[in-house]
Amino acid sequence: MVVREAMIVPQTVQGGGKGVNGCSLVSNYQNSRDLCLQSAAMEQKSKGVIENCNLGPHDVGVGWKRNSSEGSISSMDSLPCGETVFSPSDPHNSVFRKPRRLGVSESDDESVIDQSQEESLLRKSKRSVMGGTVQPHSAMAQSVDEAAPDHSSTPSDDGKDFPSSRVKFMCSFGGKILPRPSDQQLRYVGGQTRIIGINRDVNFSELRNKMRESFGQCYTFKYQLPDEDLDALVTVSSDEDLENMMEEYDKLEADGSSRLRVFLFPADQDATSFDIDSTGDLRNSEQRYVDAVNGIAESSTRRISDGVLGASPVSSDLLGLELSEPSWGLARGPDAVPMAMLATHHDPNLIHQVPVAHPVSALTGNLSNRSNAPSAPSSAPSSPPLLARNLHGKLPLVGELHQFQYLQDSQFKGVGPQYTGMPSEVAHQDSESYGGSGGSSAASQHEMHYRSTDSRRGPESPPKKFHDALHQDHPITVEQRRLSGTKMPRIGSHGKLTRLSEHSELAPSSRVDSQQMPDIHMAPGELQRLFPQQVPLQQTLWPHAMDTQQDSYRRPDMLQSSGAQPAVSGQQQQGYQPQQQLQHLFRSGLSQTGANHEGAYRQGDQQQQSQQFQEDLHVNPNYIPRSVSSHAIAAGIAAGQSTSYHGSAPSSPRPGFRELPSRHLPGGPQLQHQWTFNGAGYVDQGFGRRVMNYPDQATRSFRLSSSPPRYRDHHPHSEERLHRQAQQVSEPLHHEQVPVSGQLKFETNSVSQAQYDLVPRPQVPQYKGHNPFQEKITSFQDHQEVGDIRRHVLQQGKDNQLLAGQQHLHSILQPQRIDYQESLKQQGDQSIPIHPRFQDGQEKVAEWMVQERALEEEEARKRVLGRIRQAELEEEAAAEAVVSQHKDTHQGVYAGLHLPNDEDLLTSSLGDYPSGNRRNERLESSISNAFPFRHLPPSVLGGYTAPKSRVNPTETSHVAQYVSRPVDTDYLAVAGLRGGGNGQDMRSAALFEVNGLQQTSGYQMPSGPHRLMEERLMPSAFNPITQLQKLRINDNLALNNDMRWSGSEDVRNEPSIPARDRMGGIYEDHHQGLPGLTLGRSAGKLSRPSSNTSIPNLLDETIGEGSLLPSGPSYGTQAQGTNLIDITQSISAIDNPLYSTSYASRLSNTSLGLDSPLVTSGGMLNSSLEGTSFSDYYKIKMGDDLPNAKMPSSKIPSAEDNLSRSSSSSLSELSKSGSEDGLGGQLTMDQRTVDMVVAALDLDRSGSVVQSVLESSDAKEASLSESVHDHSLGKLGSVVGSVGTQSVWPLDSAPTLAAGLWEKKLDEAGMTEETFERHITSDGTTFEELTADDHEVLASTVDKENQEEVRTGLDEPADEDKANSTGLGSDPAAKAIARGLQTIKNADLEELRELGSGTFGTVYHGKWRGTDVAIKRIKASCFAGRPSEQERLIEDFWREACNLGHLHHPNVVAFYGVVADGPGGTLATVTEYMVNGSLKQVLQKKDRTIDRRKRLLIAMDAAFGMEYLHGKNIVHFDLKCENLLVNMRDPHRPICKVGDLGLSKVKHQTMVSGGVRGTLPWMAPELLNGNSSLVTEKVDVFSFGIVMWELLTGEEPYDKMHYGAIIGGIVNNTLRPLIPSWCDPAWRSLMERCWANEPAVRPSFSDIAKELRTMAAALQPKTQAQTQGQSHPHPQMQIV
């Protein structure tokens, strides 16, 4: 009963020590129907005491206990502080509140009861009366909610405060200290955080007891010091420690900005050892972090040992499971698998299937007593769950007991650990369902639960009747099984919990007859009723044995069923019965729960099934049967067969496991086969883990799964994984005999058994249409699996059904979402055993292979020839015309770069054509020309493992369908095309796929010229790329569906990456990459656009890194009616003798335009284009719907404009040298040079070609020119990359200047590289213009608005040639010295004392050869950053030092020189010493007064000095009183000089990037808001306005404000220093204009100087008059 209102009446307590009248209180509960307590008699004196609230400090309050006629005394503190007490005489008017300080004694009398500590845990607690008895302290102190809310600071009615008696702490407990995945910073996650209050004078023993009473156990008390990390907590273990903590509390309390934070850790556990994750496992740390944040209990240790992967992050303790209990028979041995991730609350927006993996091999025979198993209470937390299924008790098992009985006697019981994938609705039941009396009782017990949860489930969620059906063991309708919509939340590698979009509707392709699909939610009895063959349960529920040698983890939502078995020994393998093992697996395969729930084909009429299949194809051409589970193929095929899920939701659970390794299959005659998909050096680009390839194993490798593209913006490598990596296979057609066995065995009279027992595997090239929810493109193997299944099903009906279904073959091969990286191992001598049917007749198999291959090749030949026959005559005419035109000069020259399509790949492997067919000969020739390196070994094209130090694990390039190698950005550096020159953004470089490579486990070194190429094409031979040949754009607008590489026409890709280009973030996100780009040929054949690269239909597809774009062989352009944009650009060789004889340099001497080039030799648009404007070409390229299209400059230099000045070799000589090698037209090379063609093609999202180059790989030239390239091209990389922001084709030629000449031209122009970059970007000036001798032309085009940023003085002495002539080159120190900068030896300096330390260095007063100087030691952190940034900052320092050395002004501190040999290699500046130090020091001296006249003089000096500096284009960036040095020795004329100029630009970079607290009040808004493009010299004017205020008041601005408030106020123009009322109006006006928010409003220093002169002149007469008055104190007397 809840007491609504109580009347407390006093009663005199007799006795009580020293005759003190205490107040006993009797509760008279009103408004209670069943209770009425007697009121006690009350004396008048006591009544008056209560009415007048005259309770003394010795008065003790007591009260009556409920249900007691006499009443028993209890403490008045059972009432909350401030409780209303009514007087019995007038209960409505006479009221008072319980005094807050009741019981606090102010005397030393021991008899006085001090209740302050007892009340500390009970104040403000809402005390409820439980059964009429006031709850004791121990019960109420269990929750931290009642633990010590502090009211000591709340004044009582008399206004008295007690602020010092109690202290407040922010206390955290129950959580863990874990590193945050994003930055590895330690954070306290999980648990609870409360504000607690304790007495200030509490001792450690009392504090420990209070903690034990409040929290129920002993805790270690630790606290965090300010500015310390969580790994440096201070432990409180004594009274002295507690006193120190109180002192730290006082310090923080005085500041008021933060509160001391304390942590409670269990006494038996150490925080550093238990809570801080020091395992080093990133994934484990991330998962623990997520678990802790989401309130999930401690993760059980993941381990990968003995073939078992602990895939669960939740311990069994959380779930209340006792796996070691004998009644369950689940002994936790070394093969135990931790429980799957489960949580406590049901959420309909999350997954349906919660897998629970547990050993079933250890199940005992007697499971019937499981109903007697005790039910363990749930210990799950109450915080929001990570996943959404509830398992309160014992581990549920699927189905009834008798259905598991046969597991003991199974022939597989000795195999080893076997695991069960459990459906979510089974896992949803709690312990009562299995620990109670049976299924019926479980249903009744959960009736209320399902009533409540069904209401909030969603229509697609499993209702209660589905739960009931699991126990009633009757068929479940398809409506109950088709569960869709809710998905598992994805946990990215950085711990973000993301919710996937819901797809409640089934895809059209998923509507299958319910009788064809058993569901994973069916009990085993159901499955056996459908499939009487009694398939062993573990065959349908085992997960796959994962690779134990991989440091990878499976995500729980991928713990789906599979027929793969764990690894077993050879003896165990011999005990298998293959026919029984593989029997009916296809028919009994389990469908997956998710957006598509199609079941396996069951036993029945095969004609009807084939007819149904054809009907589905007619309705949906993209339909493929979802009935084929992964285990159905894994048992018979070593390569994993899997079903593609076209149109399914992104988060639908997929068949997660692949194939059973061949060594796990029964023995028998073996067929030789090899599976090579990744080179030995492949590095998982998702997480940088190296995938181990073991040639003697056939196991899979798995990688960490992650979120779909739309939710992976937080991942460090999301950009790489979001792009489709379209692997274009160039493998010749050959077959691998793969036994499919009885799993696809359907007896028919029309199909030979051999035709479906052994399925041919033609290596048909697959163009993977991009699935927007696909993380990694599946391997070529995965798509072949679907093709085999599809073709096999077609063959089960009629023979002609195979032909009828082939037209849909390409459209149905949709990419499957895979959550791990496919990586088949080379198996060496081990291979897949042949099906027993053919163990005695391998000759039949070989014969059948030959026949089948002939049919396939004939079909491919007809298709290809039929497609190219339409334009045969036109193509031949165009090709012959071009060949004859370039016959003399281009015969045998490198055939150019061409990206293959399906025509190339198919026709290149068709074998010999009829000799009389010119078309076929020409076709083969074109293929050979397109792939001059088709016979290169895998060790060259991707199989090579680059040195670890040169491998970027996040960048990979796929070569063919089986070769992957890390991209080495050092090898592929293209004239510094690295996005700002940082060398980090060379994201994509795709080696051309090479046709003709065989899949072999070992490579035999070729002979002849191929051996020469093998020997020379080693990594050391890679050269910096120096040549760009030609760019071709295909714009055929017609899409021929059957020419798309098996990608359906309706495939689209959602935007994958943020609107920021990978090249340093400088490109705009207009549109996605443009497909259909090919690199045109320079000789031999022309390139026609492929019909499968229609721009409008492919604009929505992302061309990812390493992508190879499909394009067909071309033999003419105008005949096709298409337009081509040929942009002929060439990066000329550097003007250096080392490059003069290179192949790239020689090749650039000829014009490469062949097909109506866009520009002519004069640099203008070609007039033969029939008036087509450049914008029309742009529309052809990008389409009409591209927003904000930026047109390039109309003047684009052609190849003739950019010819190298040093080369005169003819192409005929080059061709001749190539012929000597015996390669003819396939490859141009001589005995000394081997040129490897590398295409570094990267399409930014606006369609611009950022990187498209040819790489010369002359080893000798590369080694000799390394230094020249690094200096010249590396420094200009950012310039090259920055062109792309304004130009569609940022393909300007590289400068032909040597390094020294390049520096000279910049210096002559008075420009820095940054200024030149900005100039290049803004007005499109080409590099060729830079090489002009007349540098005045270049200097005149500098953007005038940005001249303020030019830090270099234009009045430097004209001795730049001195530096170049002396061979100093680009050394900034040497150049500065040559220009007259004085260097001072550190040994000549003597440091006397430290004057001060700042952000950028420490200043000392010292002596330099007897002269007083100021020595500023610059901190090394000022030059921190990437190597390129460090180099640039150092160059800026020397350049500015040189300029400062030439500054001479009386109001600028003299700059004497630079110290280059400081301690530790640090730099220092030596300047003039000012005896009085800085103006700030003068203002801080209270005994020194600065009158108005002196203020004006100091301000005038500072303005004069700044006017001089701005006239020299030098911006100070840090103008404040601290940097204004003064000499106050002359009382009549103080001197002020501007100092601290040595690092103006370095300061700017530091302050803008980080924001320096000591400089914030003087920083202009444009500096604080981060928009550096608005920075001008007016930032110094703003600072000068603040300096004027300092001079006026002598105080520091905003000295008591938080820096965040300062920044916000300045930027928002709401914060400026308060101007005193006595300020002179002229001074006020000038000061306010100086700190105006808009830079344009601020005056220049010239104007400031004028106004200050005016004010000084106006002040001069007054000063003279005062002086005259002082000299004639009695003027009237003089008059008399």
UniProtKB/Swiss-Prot annotation:
Q: Does S-adenosyl-L-methionine count among this protein's keywords?
A: no
Q: Which residues carry this modification: Phosphoserine?
A: S1248, S1365
All copies of domain PB1, residue ranges: 166-267
**Signal peptide positions on this chain:** none
Query: What subcellular compartments does it reside in?
Result: Cytoplasm
Q: Which domain of life is it from?
A: Eukaryota
EC no.? 2.7.11.1
Q: Which reaction does it catalyse?
A: L-seryl-[protein] + ATP = O-phospho-L-seryl-[protein] + ADP + H(+); L-threonyl-[protein] + ATP = O-phospho-L-threonyl-[protein] + ADP + H(+)
> Residue ranges of region Disordered?
86-163, 363-388, 417-516, 556-580, 594-613, 641-672, 700-725, 1186-1226, 1339-1372, 1661-1680
Per the Swiss-Prot or TrEMBL record, the active site comprises D1518
A GO MF term:
protein kinase activity
Q: Record's InterPro entries?
A: Kinase-like_dom_sf, PB1-like, PB1_dom, Prot_kinase_dom, Protein_kinase_ATP_BS, Ser-Thr/Tyr_kinase_cat_dom, Ser/Thr_kinase_AS, Ser_Thr_protein_kinase
Notes on how activity is controlled: Activated by auxin via rapid phosphorylation. Regulated by photosynthesis-activity-dependent changes in its phosphorylation status.
Q: Print the keywords alphabetically.
A: ATP-binding, Auxin signaling pathway, Cytoplasm, Kinase, Nucleotide-binding, Phosphoprotein, Serine/threonine-protein kinase, Transferase
* CDD domains in the cross-refs: PB1_UP2, STKc_MAP3K-like
GO process terms (BP): auxin-activated signaling pathway; cellular response to auxin stimulus; regulation of auxin mediated signaling pathway; regulation of photosynthesis; response to absence of light; response to auxin; response to blue light; response to red light
Could you name the Gene Ontology cellular component terms for this entry?
cytoplasm
- State the SUPFAM superfamilies in the record: CAD & PB1 domains, Protein kinase-like (PK-like)
* Function of the protein: RAF-like protein kinase acting as a central mediator of a fast response pathway to auxin involving proteins phosphorylation, and leading to rapid cellular responses including membrane depolarization and cytoplasmic streaming. Required for general growth and developmental process. Photosynthesis signaling kinase involved in the regulation of the sucrose metabolism involving PGM1. Necessary for optimal chloroplast electron transport rate (ETR).
Supply the PANTHER family for this chain.
AT08303P (PTHR23257:SF963), SERINE-THREONINE PROTEIN KINASE (PTHR23257)
The similarity annotation says:
Belongs to the protein kinase superfamily. Ser/Thr protein kinase family.
Q: What is this protein called?
A: RAF-like serine/threonine-protein kinase PRAF
Q: Which organism is it from?
A: Marchantia polymorpha (Common liverwort)
Q: Which gene encodes it?
A: PRAF
